[in-house]
Design a protein with these regions (language model features):
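Long, compositionally biased, charged low-complexity segments
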Residues: 7-10, 52, 71-75
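Short linear interaction motifs
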Residues: 3-21, 82, 89-90
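Intrinsically disordered, low-complexity regulatory segments enriched in Ser/Thr/Pro
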Residues: 35-60
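Intrinsically disordered, low-complexity coil/linker segments enriched for acidic/polar
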Residues: 3-6, 48, 57, 61, ...
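Low-complexity intrinsically disordered segments
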Residues: 64-94
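Amphipathic, interaction-prone secondary-structure segments
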Residues: 12-43
């Protein structure tokens, strides 16, 4: 299970970051380890990384990521399968 603390620690260690383009993502995405996923709504599709951080705090970002990765159902609702979720759990738990 992923916790907000795990995500915060990931940001602090560099394991988690917000990227504009990474691993096939076009636009803002969340990178965890070597993979990435979209986590913003379509209204923010055209933000740059700098604009993102002007609009959202780290705590807001952690909450958004947590709400996607908190369980299999939430992950699947956001287009992530169980294998991807397991990968993110293993990276954040390391």
């Amino acid at each position: 299970m992923i916790t907000r603390e795990m995500i915060r620690n990931g940001f602090e260690s560099g394991t988690v970051s917000i990227e504009e383009e990474y691993a096939g993502c076009i636009g803002i995405c969340c990178r965890i380890g070597d993979n990435a996923f979209y986590f913003l709504g379509s209204e923010d599709d055209d933000l740059t990384k700098e604009e993102y951080w002007e609009s959202y705090t780290l705590d807001m970002t952690i909450d958004m990521i947590f709400n996607i990765l908190k369980d299999v159902e939430s992950a699947e609702e956001h287009g992530l399968d169980e294998t991807e979720l397991d990968y993110y759990i293993s990276v954040l738990a390391a």
